[in-house]
Amino acid sequence: MSNIVIAAAKRTAIGSFLGQFNGVPTPTLGAAAIAAALEQSGVPASDVSEVLMGCVLSANLGQAPARQAAIAAGIPLSAGATTLNKVCGSGMKTIMLGHDLIKAGSAKVVVAGGMESMSNAPHMLPNSRTGNRFGNFQAVDHMAHDGLVNAYDGKAMGEFAECAVDKYQFTREEQDAYAIESVRRAQAAQANGAFAGEIVAVKVATRKGEVEFATDEQPGRSDIAKIPTLRPAFKKDGSVTAASSSSISDGAAAVVLLAEEDAAARGITPLARIVGHATHSQEPEWFTTAPIGAIHTLLQKTGWTLDQVDLFEINEAFAVVAMAPMRELGIPHAKINVNGGACALGHPIGASGARLVVTLVNALRTHGGKRGIATLCIGGGEATAIAIELI
C-alpha cells in the first residue's frame, strides 16, 4: 500500500465561550468542516467510506454525533460514521485511525476530524433517576467533569500545569512572555490573512439575521497589556493564569484521507502525506509533558531528526505544554505555533487535535516548510503526535 495522503484540510473559526457559536450544535460545526474539506479535496461525497469525528462532550447531542455531522454535510447514508472520545486527542486520533483503516484496506476514503461546542455542554443531575429522597442536590458541569478534571483525583487540569511549572522552574514572567507572543502571532496571522486558506465560514442565525463567521474570536478579545496583571487561576501562590491557559471554545476541523495511488488515479494533487504517528502514555498527573515522549517516539518511527522538522504545532492547553519541549528538546520557539496557539486561539477539546493538523498543513505551505509535527497532551497522561510532509 502506498502512503496515505491528506487531500484536504479545513476548519471552522474558533468561537469564544458563549460567543459567536453559542447555540450552534456540535454536529453543525462538524458538518461545516466536513463539507468544506470534501469540497476542497475534489473527492465525491459518494466515495467516502467512513467518517470519524472526535467529540468529548457528547451529552445531550442525540445519538451518534458523527453520524449527524456526516449526514448534515451531505455524506451518503451508506457511509459509516464513528464518534471518538480520547479527550483532547480525539480529533487527532481519528486521523491516526483513518490512516490505519486505509493502510489495512478496510476503507478507501476517510473523512477524519473533531468537533466541540463547549458552550453548549449541559449540566447533569447524577442519581436523579433513582431519586434524591431528601435535601438539596447538585448539578454537575458536563464540560468540567468529563473534559477538564482529572478522573482519578478530581483536580483541575491547571493544577497539574503548576506541577510542570515547578519541575522546569518556569517563572511567571516566562509564561506571560510566551502567552503574549502567542497572541501577537495569532493577531498577526489574522491581519495578514494567514488563516484564510484553512477556515470555512459558518452561517449562524442571529436576531439581526444570518451572519457568517470566518474569524477566530478570541485573539480580538485579548488585551496583551493586562496579561502580566492577571491573578493565578489554579493555585493561590501559583503562576499559571487564564492567559497562559487555553480558553474554553467552540469549533471543528476535518481532513480527507486516501491512498497516494488512489489520489493519483483520481487526478488529485494532495496537500501532504502522513509519514507516521505515535502515542505516548505516562502518569495521569504528568499529561503536560507527554508530548515530549510522543515526539521522541515519532522521530524514531520516521527516522527524522529534530533539525529536519521545519514546523511544530504543539497544543497550548497551557503555555508550559509547549515550553517544556522547548526546554527539554531544544526546539526553537520560532518553529512552534508560528501563527499562535491555543493560548490565543482557544481549545475546543474534541476538535483541537484535528485543528493542529489543519493549521500545520497550512503553515508549512505559507512559510515555505516541508516537514512538520503536530502533537498535543491528553488528560489521563497521554499524548499523540503526527508527522506530515508536504507534497
Could you describe each region identified by the protein language model?
Residues 160-162, 195-198, 205, 275-344:
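Active-site pocket-lining segment
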Residues 86-116, 165-194, 254-261, 326, ...:
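Active-site-proximal alpha-helical scaffold in enzymes
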Residues 1-24, 139, 224-289, 293, ...:
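Condensing-enzyme catalytic core mediating Claisen C-C bond formation in acyl metabolism
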Residues 1-61, 65-73, 80, 160-172, ...:
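Conserved active-site "lid/cap" helical segment
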Residues 10-12, 23-24, 29-31, 40, ...:
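N-terminal extracellular/periplasmic Venus flytrap/periplasmic-binding protein-like
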Residues 109-164:
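Flexible glycine-/small-residue-enriched beta->alpha junction loops
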Residues 55-110, 151-157, 221-247, 328-355, ...:
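Conserved catalytic cysteine-centered active-site region
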